[in-house]
């Protein structure tokens, strides 16, 4: 057996993950725009855990039963930026129940033989705007969350045509075989 040295691998910088938001959720076709005026777009999987203490064990067992993902966002407000204006209008007009699609693209994971196409995940999200702030001389800032609704969809995204294509087959789950 060959022995390999442990290596760190290649660091993934934040600009290698692109985020797109559909700014016309009621339109005939999605209008995905790059979220390019946002300083942070974090991903909090928020694993939901069930704890059981079985009679035959001294220690409790914790099982991950699901997720409640949330994407905290902080960005600047710009004129003529579709994402910024979409979020501004939700807050200023006090729109409730706004749902849209959010796509997270791994620019470091291209799809073989498909130009400008990368591994991506699509999330249905509700848009929660918690604040629009700005002191004198500052760019107005928008903060809030994109709260996931339902399950993530795995697929690929073409950054030139801005189209998402769902993967042909869902990845196999880690279910026990029962044998």
Regions found by a protein language model. Name each.
Residues 11-20, 148-163:
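Short secondary-structure transition/capping segments
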Residues 58-122, 157:
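Extracellular/virion structural assembly segments
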């Amino acid at each position: 057996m060959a022995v390999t040295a442990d290596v760190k691998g290649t660091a993934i910088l934040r600009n290698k993950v692109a985020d797109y938001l559909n700014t016309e959720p009621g339109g005939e076709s999605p209008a995905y725009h790059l979220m390019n005026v946002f300083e942070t777009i974090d991903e909090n999987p928020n694993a939901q855990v069930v704890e059981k203490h079985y009679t035959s064990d001294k220690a409790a067992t914790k099982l991950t039963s699901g997720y409640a993902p949330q994407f905290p966002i902080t960005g600047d407000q710009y004129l003529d930026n579709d994402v910024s204006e979409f979020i501004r209008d939700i807050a200023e007009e006090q729109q409730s129940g706004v749902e849209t699609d959010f796509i997270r693209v791994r620019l470091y994971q291209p799809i073989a033989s498909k130009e400008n196409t990368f591994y991506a995940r699509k999330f249905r999200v509700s848009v929660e705007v918690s604040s629009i702030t700005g002191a004198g001389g500052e760019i107005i800032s928008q903060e809030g969350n994109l709260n996931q609704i339902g399950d993530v969809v795995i697929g690929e995204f073409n950054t030139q045509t801005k189209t998402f294509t769902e993967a042909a087959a869902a990845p196999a789950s880690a279910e026990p075989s029962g044998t």
